[in-house]
């Protein structure tokens, strides 16, 4: 289990646009951290950098003091408005992802489906899922490998009160398991009720701790 993630002066440029500027952040295991800010402020890009989906232009990203290749962190990520294969069932989508990543077992998939409350509908095609059900399935794929680091981008969008409570419960359970949990949200209740530390991002800059 990764004990600490450190971002040192992370900057990300796309063309002539600077999306992230000199981001410094340290996160420790068993804690829930929050990032808030307006749409387009850089929250999702920061998540993508930590997950390894994009590389920073400058700066260091360290896991227990090591680079990604040496540390080989297990990272689960739930990105807002992401999608899966529409003609596959929820369970089939998870099995496909598991076969690609080669980290989750059938038991892990079963556990994730139960935890997000999709057992009654896991054989329904993704196309027929409601927005809330799609969010739950995306959460399931993020947690099914019991990640060291769990990144959640607006996880409570498009879900009802019961779903919000479920997301909060899973975040707390993952932190209790020892994971580092990072939540990006503009929902004040999510941020205030769950996170030990909250950071504000504006125009790619981490301005202050709330």
Listing of model-derived features with the role each one plays in the protein:
Residues 51:
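Helix-to-loop junction immediately C-terminal to a conserved catalytic motif
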Residues 36-38:
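The feature captures the beta-strand-to-loop junction immediately N-terminal to the Walker
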Residues 59-71:
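Conserved ABC transporter NBD signature motif
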């Amino acid at each position: 289990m990764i004990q600490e993630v450190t971002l040192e002066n992370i900057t990300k440029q796309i063309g002539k646009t600077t999306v992230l500027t000199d981001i410094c952040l340290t996160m420790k295991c068993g804690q829930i951290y929050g990032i808030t800010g307006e749409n387009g402020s850089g929250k999702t890009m920061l998540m993508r950098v930590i997950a390894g989906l994009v590389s920073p232009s400058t700066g260091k990203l360290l896991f227990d003091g090591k680079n990604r290749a040496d540390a080989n962190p297990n990272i689960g990520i739930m990105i807002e408005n992401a999608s899966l294969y529409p003609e596959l069932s929820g369970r089939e989508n998870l099995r496909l992802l598991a076969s690609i990543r080669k980290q989750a077992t059938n038991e892990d998939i079963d556990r994730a489906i139960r935890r997000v409350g999709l057992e009654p509908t896991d054989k329904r095609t993704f196309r027929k899922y409601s927005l809330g059900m799609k969010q739950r399935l995306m959460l399931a794929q993020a947690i099914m490998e019991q990640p060291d680091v769990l990144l959640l981008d607006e996880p409570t969008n498009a879900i009802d009160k019961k779903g919000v409570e479920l997301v909060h419960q899973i975040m707390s359970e993952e932190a209790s398991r020892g994971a580092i949990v990072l939540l990006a949200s503009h929902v004040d209740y999510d941020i205030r009720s769950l996170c030990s530390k909250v950071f504000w991002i504006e125009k790619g800059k981490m301005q202050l701790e709330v």
